[in-house]
Regions:
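Intrinsically disordered, low-complexity glycine/charged-rich regulatory or linker segments
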Residues: 1-115, 129-130, 363, 375-423
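Conserved class I S-adenosyl-L-methionine
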Residues: 128-155
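A short SAM/SAH-binding and catalytic strip from SAM-dependent methyltransferases
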Residues: 266-281, 299-303
Length: 423
């Protein structure tokens, strides 16, 4: 580092001239460089509003296709985020980024519509997840925090859930790949045995690791194709950063819950998210597997489906209470639009029912005074949390369904927040 001395009067001062190319001056914001198997975001250097391109995992010999020509993966590997790279033809310059989780979820190839980042973040926040870090000094194993997602779909919501809990788990071993390395035709049998032994050792390590997890997302889909696609989406994010916190299953909800309860009759689910048609048909099955005070979210495209869940829960006398209903989507705001969904009975019906009860007991006096006052008000103003179990609809129950404030706006769907309570 160059050092110069200047004299001011009788004092000699040392002046340090830092070179523009010294390590400290040239230090970038991040020392990270892109490596093989990373996924990058590519965008035109001169147009921040241009379409973003999500690359495939970086590998030698592969390329990113753009409107100005292709970019070889080799020219990206070794560069830092926000670096500029030219196309092979030299006709265009592009800036490369590390994609955010939301950008990755939006831009990955899809076979079903994903849950968009704003909605996924809101849904995760409604669960109020607070997983604890592993305690190496504890010798007593505790049951893990388990979130059940019915309807894996694209895997975007699964990815957001896994991000919220993955820090509670110890560092995982490499997840064994189902695709075993292909052997050359002239390979020896001993080589094949070695590959098989290595693969089996990786499987054994992974199976030994799974019981040590303190938080897990169990995701189920009826379609094997959707589940397999979601698995690749999870594995592609930062080289499978959250893959160890997710268990994928294919099948129906009744079959899966029944198989789990057959091995252990105790409730095992802390929270549940239902993102599938006819959610109300599965409430009874899932409530048997949910722990007390757990949260069940039903994510539906229409408000009538949330109403169907509320009616089903009360009709069957299930230990589920509807705490709130939110409309989500870009038009509803970041925090969701609150809806008032509850079951009520008209005061006139309550008075008539009370009169019938008095007649059955042989007296009719005091009916009006007994029902006109506080009792009728309490019934009419009952909140979802305080409501008694709903009797059949012939008993006079009706649904209140309206936005809490203002008029209804078109949104991306509705979330009903149910709480598992003591029966």
């Amino acid at each position: 580092m160059p050092i110069a001395f200047t004299r001011c009067g009788s004092a000699l001062h040392r002046v340090v001239a830092r070179s523009a190319y010294s390590p400290c001056a040239a230090r970038s914001y991040s020392s990270y460089v892109f490596q093989e198997n990373d996924i990058v975001l590519v965008q035109k250097k001169t147009d921040s509003s241009a379409k973003q391109i999500l690359s495939k995992p970086l590998r030698p010999g592969k390329r990113v296709n753009t409107s100005s020509g292709h970019i070889d993966h080799e020219s990206i590997i070794g560069l830092s985020p926000r670096a500029i790279v030219s196309t092979a033809t030299g006709k265009g310059e592009y800036r490369i980024y590390r994609p955010t989780l939301g950008e990755y979820a939006n831009l990955t190839a899809r076979i079903v519509t994903p849950v968009y980042p704003a909605d996924a973040n809101l849904i995760v926040s409604l669960l109020d997840l607070n997983p604890t870090v592993p305690d190496p000094s504890s010798s007593l194993p505790s049951p893990p925090l388990e979130i059940f997602e019915a309807g894996t779909g694209h895997g975007a919501l699964t990815l957001h859930l896994a991000r919220a809990i993955h820090a509670a788990n110890p560092a995982p071993p490499p997840i064994p790949s189902r695709a075993r390395p292909a052997l050359a035709p002239d390979s020896e049998e001993g080589t094949s045995d070695a590959v098989e032994a290595e693969y089996q050792a990786a499987v054994d390590k992974w199976e030994a690791y799974k019981p040590t997890r303190r938080a897990v997302v169990t995701t189920l889909d009826i379609s094997a194709r959707h589940s397999a696609h979601a698995k690749t989406v999870i594995a592609g994010w930062r080289r499978g950063m959250y893959a160890h916190s997710v268990d994928f299953h294919v099948g129906s909800i009744p079959e899966y819950i029944a198989s789990r309860l057959a091995t252990s009759p105790e409730p095992f689910l802390d929270h549940t998210i239902l993102d599938l048609p006819d959610c109300h048909l599965y409430l009874e099955t899932i409530s048997q597997a949910m722990k007390e005070d757990g949260t069940m979210l039903v994510f539906c495209p229409s408000i009538t489906q949330v109403i169907a869940c509320l009616k089903q829960a009360r009709k069957e006398g299930l230990p589920l209470v509807l705490e709130s209903t939110l409309e989500i989507g870009q038009a509803a705001g970041v925090g969701g639009k609150l809806w008032d969904v509850r079951a009520v009975r008209a005061r006139s019906f309550v008075r008539a029912e009370a009169a019938e009860a008095e007649k059955a007991e042989g007296g009719e006096e005091g009916v009006e005074s007994g029902t006109e006052g506080s009792e009728a008000d309490v019934v009419a103003e009952t909140t979802p949390k305080e409501a008694e179990p709903l009797k059949p609809e012939s008993d006079g129950w009706n649904m209140v369904c309206r936005p809490k404030v203002g008029d209804r706006v078109v949104g991306g769907g509705f979330v009903g927040v149910f709480r598992r309570v003591v029966k």
